[in-house]
């Protein structure tokens, strides 16, 4: 992969990570409201948070991998 393609891929991955993190934050705020109101978290909220947490971890790993590739070049 060329340097420009790697930089573009990293930027795209970082953008996706940022939007995923924002969406996760929104679901976490919803969960906090549910906990405050009922002392439980709805299944939909819990499922969304788990899915987004996994996606964020995968995107973070991809960013690190791309950064390693770029530093090795």
Where are these regions (language model features)?
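Intrinsically disordered, low-complexity terminal tails
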Residues: 1-73
């Amino acid at each position: 992969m060329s340097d420009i393609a790697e930089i573009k891929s990293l930027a795209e991955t970082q953008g996706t990570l940022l939007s995923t993190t924002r969406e996760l934050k929104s679901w976490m705020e919803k969960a906090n409201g549910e906990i405050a109101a009922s002392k439980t978290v709805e299944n939909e909220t819990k499922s969304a948070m788990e899915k987004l947490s996994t996606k964020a971890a995968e995107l973070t790993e991809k960013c690190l991998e791309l950064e390693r590739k770029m530093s090795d070049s």
